[in-house]
Amino acid sequence: MPLNKDIKKVLVIGSGPIIIGQAAEFDYSGTQACQALKEEGIEVVLVNSNPATIMTDKEIADKVYLEPLTVEFVEKVIEKERPDSLLAGMGGQTGLNLAVELYEKGILDKYNVKVIGTSIESIKEGEDRELFRDMMNRINQPVIQSEIITDLDAGIAFARKIGYPVIVRPAYTLGGTGGGIANNEEELIETLTSGLQLSTIGQVLLEKSVKGWKEIEYEVMRDSFGNCITVCNMENIDPVGIHTGDSIVVAPSQTLSDKEYQMLRSASIDIINAVGIEGGCNVQFALNPHSFEYAVIEINPRVSRSSALASKATGYPIAKVAAKIALGYGLDEIKNAVTGMTYACFEPSLDYVVVKIPKWPFDKFQGADRALGTKMMATGEIMAIGSNFEAAFLKGIRSLEIGKYSLEHKKFKDLSMYELRERVVSPDDERIFALAEMLRRGYRIDMVSKITGIDIFFLEKFRWLVEEEQKLKQSTIDDLNREWLLKLKRRGFSDKAIADMLKVSPDEIYRLRDIWHIKPAYKMVDTCGGEFEALSPYYYSTYEQYDEVVVSDNKKVVVIGSGPIRIGQGIEFDYASVHCVMALRKQEIETIVINNNPETVSTDFSISDKLYFEPLTEEDVLNIIDKEKPDGVILQFGGQTAIKLAKFLKEKNIPTLGTTSDQIDLAEDREQFDDLLERLNIARPKGKGVWSLEEGLEEARRLGFPILVRPSFVLGGQGMEITHDEEELTYYLTNAFEKDSKNPILIDKYLMGREIEVDAISDGEDVLVPGIMEHLERAGVHSGDSITMYPAQNISDKIKEDVLDYTKKLALSIGIKGMINIQFIEFEGKLYVIEVNPRASRTVPYISKVSGVPIVDIATRIMLGERLKDLGYGTGVYKEPDLVSVKVPVFSTQKLPNVEVSLGPEMRSTGEVLGVGRNVFEALYKGFVGASMYTGDKGKTILATIKKHDKKEFMELAKDLDKLGYNFIATTGTAKELREAGIDAKEVRRIGEESPNIMDLIKNKEIDLVVNTPTKANDSKRDGFHIRRAAIERNIGVMTSLDTLKALVELQKEGAHNRELEVFNLI
């Protein structure tokens, strides 16, 4: 039992949905913390709204409440479960803010709940900008000249006093939300207004900019006895001015002198002692590159994105140790699981280099402002480990899955030196490639350092890489000798990069490596620089001499992970990968994971028998397979990242378990799939590929509007749009053919029907459908952005029978062994198939949890040769539960300047929440609350701007809203129609007309909800785009689908928002 015998039942608060600034790292830390508590015999009650997480599984906590993370709902959980303690530091900013709110509202005192780990007072001192600054002054730690600002005028006055540029840092926000650098008064007014609105306490720190100084981070641990260690220090390659979440980070720091390192280490320990942290803490410093002057930027008094990175970089389990400290243990009493000999008070040492590179979502948001600053915009990140910086860096580049294997980027070749300089001085997500092009053209390193703030050490490394690339380009395969190839491999060059530059195939380089015996060795991440023997089977590749992998003769399977979190491929696939690993280990099969994401549970070395932290490219995966010689490889759970390796592995005669490469092709190739549907007599929306505007218009006239148009090769609905008439179609096709005239545009009849989705399991003979899901928004909204209901609420028994029949026919005809995801449309009483994915999908965690069927476990056992009828869950459609569960998408568009907000065929959500209720209205209300959507609880003024095709339907909803007490503001046309329908509506002027116009009302927050159905989504020149953006940036609700608005109307008519709602333990 723990040292503190009073702790028997602990409430752990999770971090909620994945959003920019708060991603999978909190599932990793939360899972680790829950396991650490259970190890001590403590009952764990978890509350988290995100169903896609491992931490909300029944194996991780004793009680799981998938409920909204609000004071109201968490109080209900506390009242029902009566925990004696609360662990707040594992749920990111969300968990921290909620713990402070529960404390300040007296709820923790009311139920006698003690906060364990870092106290509320210490959290406040770390998070409140004024308290933190005062504390730093008391302990003589330098802070940047700053002022706490709570109103605009005071901010302007302070900026005039200290001079521009200034940095705006809102209190209690996530990922720098609402903040930024202001170079002049006009920019300050805009940024400060946003920051004050988005801070939960209306407080902003305005500070003198030290843009260009080095940004250094220390991850520190402290126990309640005052023992303190630094786990890891990290250096941002990008200087201060770019959010650390958007910076390339290297560990350990590469450019600090011993004096600088020790100076900042001592400062970190002084700060963590002064604040009174008990657990983990991240300290960020700005360091003047020309002197020993430094300043404390901020601390995070909790586990964070950086602590997940530090954990994976060192092998030191920060969240687990923090949880043990919260129970009263000292660092000298907690065993290091990696070595099994040393204790947590032993500081890790690294004999390798780790590089983290962010993964940005700009492929999904073509019009987005890509400029990087103090507001975080990355959705995820990759980590790479190498025996030198260059090797780790190049591994990182190829791990990003952006089609780059070196520092060369075609788009920068034609830019002038002036244009390149502009791209480097005003950094964006592609700056590193522009910088490499400057070095390629001979730009002096000292000048590049001066204009970028990047240390000469890193620039010299980049220059060496660029020079080697140039040498290769000027050579042939005959010039390549063993010595040169070995040098290139040691510095991280992939076979593909070398082959591309020598204009040969990667197989040719692989063949030479085989002849010359140039094979990677695998080293262990051991926390102690080889000083003690390690037990952890956690490896990275290097081309040095000694190999530390022990290859067994056991039956073994490789599981390919899903790589970095990005829109369309999120934490759901890590969930599936981890469950696959658990299922294999239960069958006593040696399980090997390959992945490169430092935020996830799958890259926790305790999850699998062996973990290879490597890029998910053909070469890197093949090297591991060559080494381990597994009995099979599983690709089904790693999303598109894993599936796209299927063809390559087949060519290399490597067995994949479950569905084969040919079967994947059958499902994903449009022509083959259309032939299959015809043979099976299954309908799909009519359509074809067109090559010109004229052909497109002719096909549209044949099919009849509305029409769904999209490029022929897309993922995640990229570039899809619904057009309602010839004018809209002409606009789309003209732009599409201008961008790409070499591929056809697909034109399908758009069926405005109900979308239905299933995740099914097949063993080649039978099929099990754990549940039939219904989408709330009609077809045309990407399935990942739709509200999803289970059990389905509006589907007839006849359609359910057809769903099962079509699922069976498709799964058995394709030859699925394992998982299949199918999306249907029900239109005018008939069922159509719109998409088949021969793998796990993003709905797997949701349907697993709410149906009670362990989908991934069953699918994995089928891949190993078992049959559905022997696994205890039957076949056909599984029985429906009593409770209704609604999955609601969550968006991060507020954090991405100039991106589209409206729902459509292209996926934009970053995460999801679950709402569980006795009926669909209760579940929807909880889902809306959990997703921070508009619920009508705070204000009832609606701005309506509705396109002509939607006006008739909107008028019916407006009548209901009018009866519910809503007020309407509308532009001339809509206002006139509302009045004609007997609804009072205030008229407002359009954008660009004299004040007060629409924009004035939004800026003054005189509107509570914007209902805007877009005429042309993604067109940033149109009024609708500006209205949606202005509203979302001011935390005003926006609905662009009348189906979502109808759901709001129905739950209000049912009074779900006024009921005393229950909370449900899903175990």
Swiss-Prot record:
<protein>
    <recommendedName>
        <fullName>Carbamoyl phosphate synthase large chain</fullName>
        <ecNumber>6.3.4.16</ecNumber>
        <ecNumber>6.3.5.5</ecNumber>
    </recommendedName>
</protein>
<dbReference type="InterPro" id="IPR011607">
    <property type="entry name" value="MGS-like_dom"/>
</dbReference>
<feature type="binding site">
    <location>
        <position position="783"/>
    </location>
    <ligand>
        <name>ATP 2</name>
    </ligand>
</feature>
<feature type="binding site">
    <location>
        <position position="210"/>
    </location>
    <ligand>
        <name>ATP 1</name>
    </ligand>
</feature>
<feature type="binding site">
    <location>
        <position position="298"/>
    </location>
    <ligand>
        <name>ATP 1</name>
    </ligand>
</feature>
<keyword id="KW-0055">Arginine biosynthesis</keyword>
<feature type="region of interest" description="Carboxyphosphate synthetic domain">
    <location>
        <begin position="1"/>
        <end position="401"/>
    </location>
</feature>
<feature type="binding site">
    <location>
        <position position="284"/>
    </location>
    <ligand>
        <name>Mg(2+) 1</name>
    </ligand>
</feature>
<feature type="binding site">
    <location>
        <position position="823"/>
    </location>
    <ligand>
        <name>Mn(2+) 3</name>
    </ligand>
</feature>
<feature type="binding site">
    <location>
        <position position="242"/>
    </location>
    <ligand>
        <name>ATP 1</name>
    </ligand>
</feature>
<feature type="domain" description="ATP-grasp 1">
    <location>
        <begin position="133"/>
        <end position="327"/>
    </location>
</feature>
<feature type="region of interest" description="Carbamoyl phosphate synthetic domain">
    <location>
        <begin position="550"/>
        <end position="932"/>
    </location>
</feature>
<keyword id="KW-0028">Amino-acid biosynthesis</keyword>
<dbReference type="InterPro" id="IPR036897">
    <property type="entry name" value="CarbamoylP_synth_lsu_oligo_sf"/>
</dbReference>
<keyword id="KW-0677">Repeat</keyword>
<feature type="binding site">
    <location>
        <position position="300"/>
    </location>
    <ligand>
        <name>Mg(2+) 2</name>
    </ligand>
</feature>
<dbReference type="GO" id="GO:0004087">
    <property type="term" value="F:carbamoyl-phosphate synthase (ammonia) activity"/>
</dbReference>
<feature type="binding site">
    <location>
        <position position="298"/>
    </location>
    <ligand>
        <name>Mn(2+) 2</name>
    </ligand>
</feature>
<feature type="binding site">
    <location>
        <position position="837"/>
    </location>
    <ligand>
        <name>Mg(2+) 4</name>
    </ligand>
</feature>
<dbReference type="InterPro" id="IPR033937">
    <property type="entry name" value="MGS_CPS_CarB"/>
</dbReference>
<feature type="binding site">
    <location>
        <position position="298"/>
    </location>
    <ligand>
        <name>Mn(2+) 1</name>
    </ligand>
</feature>
<feature type="binding site">
    <location>
        <position position="175"/>
    </location>
    <ligand>
        <name>ATP 1</name>
    </ligand>
</feature>
<feature type="binding site">
    <location>
        <position position="749"/>
    </location>
    <ligand>
        <name>ATP 2</name>
    </ligand>
</feature>
<dbReference type="GO" id="GO:0005737">
    <property type="term" value="C:cytoplasm"/>
</dbReference>
<feature type="domain" description="MGS-like">
    <location>
        <begin position="933"/>
        <end position="1067"/>
    </location>
</feature>
<dbReference type="InterPro" id="IPR036914">
    <property type="entry name" value="MGS-like_dom_sf"/>
</dbReference>
<feature type="region of interest" description="Allosteric domain">
    <location>
        <begin position="933"/>
        <end position="1067"/>
    </location>
</feature>
<feature type="binding site">
    <location>
        <position position="835"/>
    </location>
    <ligand>
        <name>Mn(2+) 4</name>
    </ligand>
</feature>
<feature type="binding site">
    <location>
        <position position="243"/>
    </location>
    <ligand>
        <name>ATP 1</name>
    </ligand>
</feature>
<feature type="binding site">
    <location>
        <position position="835"/>
    </location>
    <ligand>
        <name>ATP 2</name>
    </ligand>
</feature>
<feature type="binding site">
    <location>
        <position position="241"/>
    </location>
    <ligand>
        <name>ATP 1</name>
    </ligand>
</feature>
<keyword id="KW-0547">Nucleotide-binding</keyword>
<feature type="binding site">
    <location>
        <position position="837"/>
    </location>
    <ligand>
        <name>Mn(2+) 4</name>
    </ligand>
</feature>
<keyword id="KW-0067">ATP-binding</keyword>
<feature type="binding site">
    <location>
        <position position="129"/>
    </location>
    <ligand>
        <name>ATP 1</name>
    </ligand>
</feature>
<comment type="pathway">
    <text>Pyrimidine metabolism; UMP biosynthesis via de novo pathway; (S)-dihydroorotate from bicarbonate: step 1/3.</text>
</comment>
<dbReference type="GO" id="GO:0005524">
    <property type="term" value="F:ATP binding"/>
</dbReference>
<dbReference type="InterPro" id="IPR005483">
    <property type="entry name" value="CbamoylP_synth_lsu_CPSase_dom"/>
</dbReference>
<dbReference type="InterPro" id="IPR011761">
    <property type="entry name" value="ATP-grasp"/>
</dbReference>
<feature type="domain" description="ATP-grasp 2">
    <location>
        <begin position="674"/>
        <end position="864"/>
    </location>
</feature>
<keyword id="KW-0460">Magnesium</keyword>
<dbReference type="InterPro" id="IPR016185">
    <property type="entry name" value="PreATP-grasp_dom_sf"/>
</dbReference>
